[in-house]
C-alpha cells in the first residue's frame, strides 16, 4: 500500500476517534445514559405577582430557569389575600372575561416546587397550585402551574412591599408597559 494511502487512512482514524470523543463528552454533559431517577423532573411555573421577580424567586427556588414572558387571558390580578407579613393585600387571579394577567414562565425542579407549595401555604389550604393554559410570547400555548387564593376575600389595598417586588419583576422581564404603569400608580399612593 502506498505511503500516501496509509497516511490518509491514519488521518481518517484520528478524525473518527476525535468525533467519537466529542460525541461522548456532549452526551455526558446533557445527561444521556443516566438513569431516569437521577434526572430532575421540571415543572413549568407561571409567576404573575411577586413570583414575577426572578431575584425574589431564586431565594426559594435556586434551580429556577427563566423561559419567557406569558399571559393568562380572561383573568385579572386582584389583591384578595391579606398578608400580616407584608402589611396589606397580596395577589391572586380572578376570572374576568376580556381580562389579562401578565407574568413569566420559569422551569423549577419538582422538589423545589413542592417546597414552594409550603411557602405559598398550599398545605394550609390558603393558596392552591393549579395548572392553566398560558400564552407564551412566542404565540404558543403552554400548560403551567400557578398559585391562586383558595377563598378570595377583600379586595385589600396592595401591600407596599409586595408592590415593590411585583414592580421589580415586571421591570426585570420587561412585562407589558401599561401593566407596569398601573403597578407604579398603585405604588405611588405610598409616597
Task: Please name every model-derived segment.
Residues 3, 24-25, 174:
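Detector for intrinsically disordered, low-structure N-terminal pre-sequences
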Residues 6, 21-22, 35:
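Intrinsic disorder/low-complexity segments
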Residues 12-22:
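Bacterial N-terminal signal peptides that target proteins for export
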Residues 1-11:
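Short, Lys/Arg-enriched N-terminal segments with co-localized hydrophobic residues
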Residues 20-31:
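Bacterial N-terminal signal peptides
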Residues 32-191:
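Glycine-aromatic micro-motifs
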